[in-house]
């Protein structure tokens, strides 16, 4: 465990001349939103852009961090995700949509990601996409990523194409990007 000052020193010691951004991701950065905010401020003071990837489970914590972030990737979960308790889903999706709206309103470079598996139902995916594009549009997001799970419950190519086809009318630059960290066995 490190203090904020120790973490800032570690960042400073490890910056390379070609460092073009610092990512706050892995696990869930908003669990430590105050630390992320301080570290992001430090990074920005060096003239380096900051990037946050989050499931946005708490819009208040997200709003605390947002002023110090340049790029935001918001990860949405479908109601049939194995990682979500269905009774908590309405609150999660409410918070995630509020974070999307806040990011867009703050003119952040905003990306959307939905992780899908063989268990993801087309109807729940479609419903989520409809909710997202009641807030977002092709003019105010910079990317839409569909990320298939790797190894466990991998969706078929046909299913991925169906998901792609449901996003395409809203956003024609939709991408399907695998979980590279799992493919290369990164932690």
Located regions from the model:
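Conserved alpha-helical substructure of the radical SAM core
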Residues: 1-22
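Conserved AdoMet/S-adenosylmethionine-binding subsite of the radical SAM
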Residues: 18-19, 30-174, 179-187
């Amino acid at each position: 465990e490190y203090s904020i000052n120790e973490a800032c020193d570690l960042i400073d010691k490890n910056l390379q001349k070609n460092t073009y951004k610092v990512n706050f991701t892995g696990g869930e950065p908003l669990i430590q939103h105050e630390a992320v905010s301080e570290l992001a401020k430090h990074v920005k003071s060096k003239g380096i852009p900051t990037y946050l990837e989050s499931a946005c489970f708490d819009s208040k914590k997200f709003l605390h961090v947002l002023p110090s972030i340049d790029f935001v990737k918001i990860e949405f979960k479908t109601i049939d995700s194995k990682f979500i308790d269905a009774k908590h889903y309405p609150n999660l999706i409410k918070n995630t949509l509020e974070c999307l709206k806040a990011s867009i309103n703050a003119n952040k470079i905003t990306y959307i990601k939905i992780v899908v598996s063989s268990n993801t139902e087309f109807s729940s995916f479609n419903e989520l996409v409809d909710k997202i594009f009641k807030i977002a549009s092709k003019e105010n997001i910079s990317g839409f990523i569909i990320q298939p799970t790797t190894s466990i419950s991998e969706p078929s190519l046909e299913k991925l194409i169906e998901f792609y086809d449901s996003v395409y009318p809203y956003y024609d630059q939709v991408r399907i990007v695998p979980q590279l960290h799992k493919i290369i066995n990164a932690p």
